């Protein structure tokens, strides 16, 4: 059972890393030599950042299965929203509305 969980965790990490790599395609397109050079330079900077991020994703240990966060999530998943009763149809007048009506009548 733990082997399967480990394998699923590894697959999830690899999918995330693959998604990161797909978000940074190699630059293409026309332009002057300096424009192409700058695009490649910026691409290479992003590529290095993605490699560093992918390395930290891959090497970061998975949290234990029974961590307080997992227990809190399980508790929150058990919560449900109950049906609320219908609001009353006839509400008594508030004191503010009666005072304003009296002032209008006096004026």
Swiss-Prot record:
Report the protein's function.
Escorts unspliced or incompletely spliced viral pre-mRNAs (late transcripts) out of the nucleus of infected cells. These pre-mRNAs carry a recognition sequence called Rev responsive element (RRE) located in the env gene, that is not present in fully spliced viral mRNAs (early transcripts). This function is essential since most viral proteins are translated from unspliced or partially spliced pre-mRNAs which cannot exit the nucleus by the pathway used by fully processed cellular mRNAs.
The record's note on its domains: The RNA-binding motif binds to the RRE, a stem-and-loop structure present in incompletely spliced viral pre-mRNAs. This region also contains the NLS which mediates nuclear localization. These overlapping functions prevent Rev bound to RRE from undesirable return to the nucleus. When Rev binds the RRE, the NLS becomes masked while the NES remains accessible.
What residue spans carry the region label Homomultimerization? 16-24
| Entry GO MF terms | DNA-binding transcription factor activity; RNA binding
Native species of this protein?
Answer: Human immunodeficiency virus type 2 subtype A (isolate NIH-Z)
Q: Which GO terms describe its cellular component?
A: host cell cytoplasm; host cell nucleolus
Bias kind Polar residues: ranges: 21-34, 91-107
Q: What is this protein called?
A: Protein Rev
